[in-house]
Regions:
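Transmembrane-helix signature of 12-pass secondary carriers
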Residues: 1-384
């Protein structure tokens, strides 16, 4: 007889009892590769916009339209990924969004003018926004609850290293080969990851929650067999899942989820405004202020080191101080440094304070956006 409910197979409890094994590292690598390229694609905008502005190919107004198109697309993508991920599965959603931003990035490398590039950037943004939502949520559903903070922290480190990587790659590629190669590079790599991700299984938690218990059992059995090679598995602690169905998205705006939704939305707004508003515009402002493309990318690269550093700090603080205290502390630090940054007169001070500011922002990103928000909601609402 086919199984029909999570209570029959105990998907969550069986995943939570597993020791770390090769399966978990493969999942981290596959999700991390897509998330890295997603963030790389987002952050390459700063260097590209500085270059097209310097070349006279664009204006500040068109650059603003480019940035706006990116985030309108990301907003739509994040919304759609939640609906599609809940309806058709996590696997469908993360493959679709990777294909969207990969193919559109390749097309952007051949854009004949800035207006076409802006339209393509909007399409890219749809894929970028979806990947961010699906990536963190999917890893949350695969790894054990006891070590989830460390796994999500590692994913945040991988993802946020892309800020430094995109700055360093741009520092060489843009002045020597041109900005188009930045889009071509990330697009081709995204399609390589898309092929590799075809081997990634669906989330057993999602399958069980959607009445596909036989498929969930097959995946769980394979994972358990691999984990059992390290030694006997601990006993499963039975858990009774909530019987509430996913229902409408408006359920998120009713108790007990209303407060969580407001908190999650606030964290996303603060992190998004701080991160993308500051980093995305920085090279353009420097070029407009008289700096060369190379020097502006150099300053940005130094500040970009705060991405992986902040993520590592967030990984440590989340387990030692807890999510909430880490979020509050990093938010205060980012606010103070943000007020001080415009008053820096020389390049060294500008880079130093900028590095500290980016570090604080990424501590907030790693602990709030990556770790805390996905844990606020159960499987049936996690992608919404």
């Amino acid at each position: 007889m086919a199984r029909s409910a999570d209570i029959d197979i105990n998907a969550g409890a069986r995943l939570d009892r597993l020791p770390t094994c090769g399966f978990h590292w493969r999942i981290l690598a596959l999700i991390g590769a897509g998330m890295f390229l997603d963030a790389f694609d987002i952050y390459l905008a700063g260097g590209v916009l500085g270059a097209v502005l310097k070349d006279g190919w664009s204006t500040l107004e068109l650059n603003a339209a480019f940035v706006s198109a990116t985030f309108v697309g990301m907003t739509i993508g994040a919304w759609l990924s939640g609906i599609l991920g809940d309806r058709f599965g996590r696997r469908f959603s993360y493959q679709m969004n990777l294909a969207i931003f990969g193919l559109a990035s390749i097309a952007a490398a051949f854009a004949p003018n800035m207006m076409v590039l802006i339209v393509l950037r909007f399409i890219i943004g749809i894929g970028l926004g979806a990947e961010i939502v699906v990536g963190y949520a999917t890893l949350t559903e695969f790894v054990p609850a006891a070590s989830r903070g460390r796994w999500i922290g590692l994913l945040a480190v991988i993802t946020n290293f892309s800020l430094f990587a995109s700055s360093m790659v741009g520092l060489w590629v843009i002045p020597t080969l041109g900005w188009r190669y930045m889009f071509g590079l990330v697009g081709i790599l995204a399609m390589v990851v898309w092929i590799l991700r075809k081997s990634m299984p669906e989330s057993p938690r999602w399958l069980a929650a959607n009445g596909r218990a036989d498929e969930a059992e097959d995946i769980l059995s394979a994972i358990e067999a691999e984990a059992a090679r390290k030694g006997p598995l601990s006993a499963v602690v039975a858990s009774v899942p909530a019987q509430e169905s996913a229902g409408s998205v408006w359920r998120l705006f009713q108790p007990p989820y209303l407060a969580r939704t407001l908190l999650g939305s606030l964290l996303h707004i603060v992190v998004g405004f701080s991160l993308y508003g500051f980093i995305g515009w920085l090279p353009s402002f420097m070029v407009k202020g008289g700096h060369s493309v190379v020097s502006s990318l150099g300053y940005t690269s130094v500040m970009a080191l705060g991405g992986p550093v902040g993520s590592l700090i967030g990984l440590v603080l989340a387990d030692r101080l807890g999510r909430r205290l880490s979020i509050v502390g990093s938010s205060i630090a980012a606010a103070v440094l943000g007020l001080a940054y415009p008053h820096m007169a020389d390049g060294i001070a500008l880079a130093a304070v900028g590095f500290l500011l980016v570090t604080a922002i990424y501590v907030m990103l790693a602990t709030g956006f990556a770790m805390h928000v996905p844990e606020l909601f159960p499987t049936r609402y996690r992608l919404r």
